[in-house]
Amino acid sequence: MTSQASAQAAGNTWPRLISALINGADLTADNTEWAMDTIMSGEATPSQIAGFLVALRSKGETVDEIAGLVEAMLAHANPVDIAGEKLDIVGTGGDQLNTVNISTMAALVCAGAGAKVVKHGNRASSSSSGSADVLEALGVRLDLPIERVARNAEEAGITFCFAQVFHPSFRHTAVPRRELAIPTAFNFLGPLTNPARVQASAVGVANERMAPLVAGVLAKRGSRGLVFRGSDGLDELTTTGPSTVWEIRNGEVTEQTFDPQALGIRAATVEELRGGDATANAAVVRDVLSGVAGPARDAVLLNAAAGLVAFDVDAEGTLTDRMAAALKRAEESIDSGAAAAVLEKWVALTRG
């Protein structure tokens, strides 16, 4: 029996689900898991996918609805087995601010500080340089067999799960997403569907309404970490002003405002964080890892500190206290050369 046939026997059909959404009813996680499984299996038409996404967005997604999408997407992913505690630092994109690759640099700094980082990302969609683009410009090969992706995490302390390699079934969404050309729930699934199933996440979300939902899904799935949104709309912890932070610990989500000036970080402007294409942004990565001071370094240190706070399950104290301690570790990672050494070893492993 196909997934369509078995689901119809259980009452799940596209007309039923889309009609419910149009009428303002929330779906269950089982409903959306069926929908995503059908999409990932190639059994949904572009019209059904588009209708579902638009109806879901118009009603407004819930934690359970997103959780169902995530469950099905992970079920269709190519798994990668990486032992131990793992961290992902990632932004959803979509802030339209075209900054340098802050989360990618922060990931390298966290690895230099001893965290095992499994970054999940893709090429740019709304900016000039996504994580995959800048890593390629730095010399990291992305077209690796899955076993080598896992080995890099063990030997270099960091690896990259290229979304299009690990989520091949997501190709079925390409046409309706391209033709809709609007943000949908699918724009927020990347940080929630790391195929290594990381235990800790530091996630930047530009969309103000979706940020607490992303935190809620992480909590529902038993993850820990931080979700944040800059007051300037940046999908990072911003240095231009305060950020809203949702912390996930022990299945609970707490919301607070975090001001980087409390850590002595100088206020920057968005223009000072502006990036370019992959080549230009790769040059910024090399500068930051070599110890060049300035707004880019400050933003990287702040977001690396967030990653280390997410990773360190045993740390105590207020968020500001834990961020201050983690900031010192991030500074040491750069200033000792450890972060740069991680990148050098990673490039060599992917090229060997």
From Swiss-Prot:
Domain of life of the source: Bacteria
Disulfide pairings: none
GO cellular component, as recorded: cytosol
Keywords: Amino-acid biosynthesis, Aromatic amino acid biosynthesis, Glycosyltransferase, Magnesium, Metal-binding, Transferase, Tryptophan biosynthesis
Record flagged with keyword Signal: no
A Pfam match: Glycos_transf_3
UniProt: 5-phospho-alpha-D-ribose 1-diphosphate binding residues: 91, 94-95, 99, 101-104, 119-127, 131
Binding residues for anthranilate 1: G91, N122
Chain positions recorded as Mg(2+) 2 binding sites: D235, E236
Record-listed Mg(2+) 1 binding positions: S103, E236
Record InterPro entries: Anthranilate_Pribosyl_Tfrase (IPR005940), Glycosyl_Trfase_fam3 (IPR000312), Glycosyl_Trfase_fam3_N_dom (IPR017459), Glycosyl_Trfase_fam3_N_dom_sf (IPR036320), Nuc_phospho_transferase (IPR035902)
Biological process terms in GO annotation: L-tryptophan biosynthetic process
EC number from the UniProt entry: 2.4.2.18
Transmembrane segments: none
Catalysis performed (reactions): N-(5-phospho-beta-D-ribosyl)anthranilate + diphosphate = 5-phospho-alpha-D-ribose 1-diphosphate + anthranilate
Listed GO MF terms: anthranilate phosphoribosyltransferase activity; magnesium ion binding
Binding site for anthranilate 2: R177
Cofactor(s) required, per the database record: Mg(2+)
Pathway annotation: Amino-acid biosynthesis; L-tryptophan biosynthesis; L-tryptophan from chorismate: step 2/5
Cofactor note: Binds 2 magnesium ions per monomer.
Assembly, per entry: Homodimer.
Function recorded in the entry: Catalyzes the transfer of the phosphoribosyl group of 5-phosphorylribose-1-pyrophosphate (PRPP) to anthranilate to yield N-(5'-phosphoribosyl)-anthranilate (PRA).
NCBIfam families associated with the record: trpD
Family: Belongs to the anthranilate phosphoribosyltransferase family.
Protein name per UniProt: Anthranilate phosphoribosyltransferase
